[in-house]
Structures are given as C-alpha cells and as structure tokens.
Amino acid sequence: MLRWGVMSENIMRIIDLRGQNLSRAELLAAMPRAAMGTSEATDLVRPILDDVKERGAAALRDFEEKFDHVRPKNLRVPVEAIKDALTTLDPEVRAAIEESVRRARAVAANQVPKDFYTDLAEGARVAERWIPIQRVGLYVPGGKAVYPSSVIMNAVPAQAAGVESLAIATPPARDNEEGLPNKTILATCAILGVDEVYAVGGAQAIAMFAYGAKGSEPQDGDILCDPVDKITGPGNIFVATAKSLVSAFVGIDAVAGPTEIGIIADETANPSLLAADLIGQAEHDELAGSVLFTDSTEIADKVQESLKYRVPRTEHAERVHTSLSGTQSAIVLTDGLDQSIDAANAYAAEHLEIQTKDADAVVKRIKNAGAIFRGPYSPVPLGDYMSGSNHVLPTGGTARFAAGLGVHTFMKPVEVIEYDEEGLKALAARINAFAVSEDLPAHGECVLSRFVKDPYDKATLREQEKEAGLR
C-alpha cells in the first residue's frame, strides 16, 4: 500500500528521442502503448452473446448474478424508480449535471449537419439528406466509478440528432437489493427525459442491444428489449470485444481501449499542473496511458519530483502508481517543439493538452487527437464533465483516422439523385459507353431503354441514339 510521504524513485519511465531522425514507422513504434490481448476476452464473450441471443432475459439475469453479484427483479428499470432517483439527488450534484447538459446541448445544436444539393446541369441535381438513426442503445459503464457524465455524452448528441428511440444499459448497483442501477445515473436519465433504462452491464448488455431479448418473467413482457440499429458508449475490454463481435450487423461508435492523455509542454509550463493532469488521467484505470512530450529536461525532472509528492497523497494512489509506471505511460524527451508535435501526432492521444508558450500555433499543427485542450486552464476533466465537448473519444491511436462521439455519430448521410428526362438524356450515350467498358452492358441498356426502341440491336444502336438525340 502507498502511504503518505514522498517517494524516492521516479515513477514514470523516460523515452529519449533526442538526436534521432526517426522514420514514421519508427516513431509509431516508439510510442508507449500497453499490450492489449483480446483472444482470451473473445473466448469469454462469444458464449455470452450466443446465450443472450438464445435465452434472452433469462440469460441476462444469470449473467448479472454471475458478474455483478445481484439478480435484478426488473431488468428494465421502472419509470417510477427513475423519477424517484431525481427527487433524492443532492442539489449541488443536480445543478452540476444540469449545467453540463445545458452546455452539451448548446454545442450539439450547432453540430447538426445541414442538407444540401448540387445542380450539375439543367434537370440534374444530387442532394444529400442527413437522416437520424432510428434506434440506439447507449452503454454506460460501472466498475471502478459511477459515470453519469457518460449518460450525458451519449444521450445529448443522440437527442440533438433526432434519434426516435433511445435505450440505456448500465450495471445494477451491488449495494441495491432490488438490482437497480446507481441512483445518480438514474437521476441523470430523468433530467434528460430517457425512460428506457436497463439494469444490465457488460457483454450481456451489448448482446441485448444487438439481438434484442425476449422476456422470461411476467414483468418482462413478451419482448424485454427490441434490437437497436447502433450501440455507443465506453466500457471495459469485454464490452469492447462484444461490440467488435456484433459490429458486422449492428453499428457501433468504436472499439474503445483504456483512456489516455498526451501533453505537449515546453519550458513555460507549470510542472505541478502537468503532474496533476497526468495523475488525473491515471486515476481512471491501471491501464490508462499518460504521456508527456517535452524538450525540457528541467520540466521532466520537476514533473517527476511533483509526482513523487502527489501520487501517495491522492485517494486512488495504488491505481495511479500502477498506471503511471506501466509501459503505456512515459515522459518522452525530444529535441524541440517540432519533434514533440511529430511524436504527439504519432501517438494520436485520446486527449491532448497543449501547454506551450504559443499554444495556438501548436494547435494548428495537430493532425491526430481525439480532442485538443488548449492552455493550462483547459484541463481534461473540464472536457470530461462541463466544457460542452464530448468525452467519448477515440483511443489506442485510432484518432489517426477516427473522431469522437457527436451528433454525426447518430445520423447518416443519404444522397438523393434527382434527374429529369433531359438531364439523363444528356448522359445516356456516355453511361452506355462506360458500362460496356466494364463489361456490364445491361447497365447501359437500362438507361438506353428510356430513349431508344431496341437497345439490344447493336447493329442499329448508334443510329437509334442519333434519332433519339443522344448523340
């Protein structure tokens, strides 16, 4: 056990990139990452998915008893329990949640994409409509902490997108004899107006959303839960594996790994604040990644000293120490700001803080990050709770090609092709030529049939095209 006092040894390892002209592949390989084996998780999760698919609510109750050590009487939380949770919510916590919701809704309202159209010629238009996904399942994890903030981050953009049907699954609280979820989570659902909530966690919750679940007891009804079109929300490796396994036939936001922070800092940064920010992320999980990129050995040394003082004094000291001393965390020493930026882009952090003299200039050069936190007064916990931004972000380097959760996550763009007779007529001969070149003549014949008498008479086709005004 870690106790009050000052630690003697440095906590974080050093990765020294100075004096090295690394290729892109070498830079990617040098970044600190935890080894994430998924084969064992897959072997454990697949039978859970199959059992829920087959037995529905009966399997869900069995798995809740096995994994969460409680057998919920009502897998679907009664609406009265959701309302009651709000009446007993601490007023200060309620005010914080409501402010978070207000800010998240303001940002989400501006994220709603607009339909548009392009006129290419007379009678030739292509439009794009953004259509909300009809039914979405939102997963809110339990485990080491309670996450009402995850309810907000998932539900608010879905509501802004216009999703018709929202369902939330979250594990039952182990200290609740009835098997109800945490009351703060239920109260947050009440504030957001979400009343379809299930006391189901883990891989079994993902299975319920993906396949739906038939009832097994009278209170369940014939159908406990209808299948959804998309599943969003963070979770542990078993939740992530389950999402991956069902993603062939139901949409998912991402396969999320452990949370992570990257910080670019120069000699102007405050080392005590840097240490506090690294600790704040490490608090999430023993596998959480915390990485500092700096060209200042003085800053690196002072951060190590601050960590020695701070880590033993934080409540979850053992968890934090395990995370910061793990292979997924490091202080990366660079030759200068340019190399720090290159390394940060290679790392592609879920959260990237910029604590440098000219933060705006650095922000403009960031290509890969789930979210960017500019300056010392924009720490990651601000984004976790209250900034208005979304905290469901790509992890494990996937910010190189993926984005965080937003209104767009819950919508799909659909193109509408609107050509009239003259618009198609102007292209008919060219479409036919294109189709023939790909050995798909029926494609061309389909178009020509609208203008010529016999598109199959190749001997007279060119003449027919001329008579029809296609040439």
UniProtKB/Swiss-Prot annotation:
Q: Cite the entry's keywords alphabetically.
A: Amino-acid biosynthesis, Histidine biosynthesis, Metal-binding, NAD, Oxidoreductase, Zinc
Task: Give the protein's function.
Answer: Catalyzes the sequential NAD-dependent oxidations of L-histidinol to L-histidinaldehyde and then to L-histidine.
Signal sequence extent: none
- Kindly provide the name given to this protein in its UniProt entry: Histidinol dehydrogenase
Give the active-site positions: 350 (proton acceptor), 351 (proton acceptor)
Task: Tell me which residues bind Zn(2+).
Answer: 281, 284, 384, 443
Q: Which Gene3D superfamilies match?
A: 1.20.5.1300, Nitrogenase molybdenum iron protein domain
How is the cofactor bound, in the record's words? Binds 1 zinc ion per subunit.
Q: Which family does it belong to?
A: Belongs to the histidinol dehydrogenase family.
The cross-references to HAMAP family, in alphabetical order and at most eight, read: HisD
Q: Where does NAD(+) bind?
A: 139, 204, 236
> GO molecular function terms here?
histidinol dehydrogenase activity; NAD binding; zinc ion binding
One short Pfam name that applies is: Histidinol_dh
Cofactors, names only: Zn(2+)
Q: Which reaction does it catalyse?
A: L-histidinol + 2 NAD(+) + H2O = L-histidine + 2 NADH + 3 H(+)
The gene designation is hisD
